[in-house]
Amino acid sequence: MGRVVVEVMLKPEILDPQGQAVLNALPRLGFDGFSSVRQGKRFELSVDGEVTDEVLAQVREAATTLLSNPVIEDVVAVVGAP
């Protein structure tokens, strides 16, 4: 059984209000030294059999179609990542 991890992040030019809220809260909680926070989504997909190039292409297509908004988000799919 193979596994693919899909990470969905806002494109760099898109403002991230949730990330900004976390960044603003960090010093209030005693965590200093952070200059930026970006929030995203992570999906772990288990596939039957080995992860081939065809399977990875299908995962990327599904991620672009279903798991993300390609207008404002970027998708990265990695085979077998922890």
Predicted regions and their residues:
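Non-catalytic terminal accessory/regulatory regions of metabolic enzymes
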Residues: 1-82
